[in-house]
Amino acid sequence: MSTWIFLRGLTRESGHWGAFTAQFESALPGCEVVALDLPGNGSLCHQASPLRVPDMVEHCRAELDRRWLPPPYHLLGMSLGAMVAVAWSAAHPDEVAAQVLINTSLRPFSPFYQRLRPRNYGLLLRLALLGADPEDWERSILRITSRGGQDAVLPQWLALRAQHPVTRANALRQLLAAARYRAPKVMTIPTLLLASGQDQLVSVACSQALARQWQCRLQVHPTAGHDLPLDDG
């Protein structure tokens, strides 16, 4: 049996995978999916988010050890979660069998304006610094991360937000950790990159640059948005 560790992105939690985890397990018989929350998100919303991506890795490793789930692991990470996967693979390659990275962006391979599209600066700053009505917040995030008209998930997202509220301080801490992280120039772990051609948050050029740097496989979905598992899981 293979163990797949799912890692979500900025301010998102394991619940945001929705039905994708069950679909994944059905598609790959014999695999076990473990969706982890990063500190500050989900069931860990009362913890302070680490300011360094490697510290997020160590939290995940400790949690899996606590659950008696030994390596090797297959990692599937999206956005910030993909950065955690990369840092994990670089620091502990003996623990990682392979990794799938979805719509991620990494220093030093991509400029800031590709890692976060400028059209979103104003909205994200307003949400992070000034806050917003919960429905306005989640609807705004859905609008910039999905291209599939997935309004049906909004009530679920609002319920997750009410149950596990992410503080503005933790949102900023996660954003800072993501901005500061520098990826290795060489990757020895088998890696598959998945990118969305209609990603409105992160340019597909980031995954293309990473594929060139690491000489790894890249698959581009032509119509999905940033939240690829939501749009076409």
Give residue ranges: language-model regions.
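Flexible "cap/lid" loop of the alpha/beta hydrolase fold
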Residues: A90, A98-A128
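Gly/Ala-rich beta-loop-alpha elbow adjacent to hydrolase catalytic centers
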Residues: G77-G81, A85
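Catalytic histidine-centered segment of alpha/beta-hydrolase-like enzymes
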Residues: A224-G233
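Short beta-strand/loop motif that positions the catalytic acidic residue
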Residues: M187, L193-A195, D199
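Conserved alpha/beta-hydrolase catalytic His-Asp/Glu region
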Residues: A132-K185
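Active-site loop/oxyanion-hole signature of alpha/beta-hydrolase fold enzymes
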Residues: E32-L76
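Conserved HGGG/HGGXW glycine-rich cap/lid loop of the alpha/beta-hydrolase fold
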Residues: M1-H46
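Conserved alpha/beta-hydrolase "acid-adjacent" motif
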Residues: Q200-C206
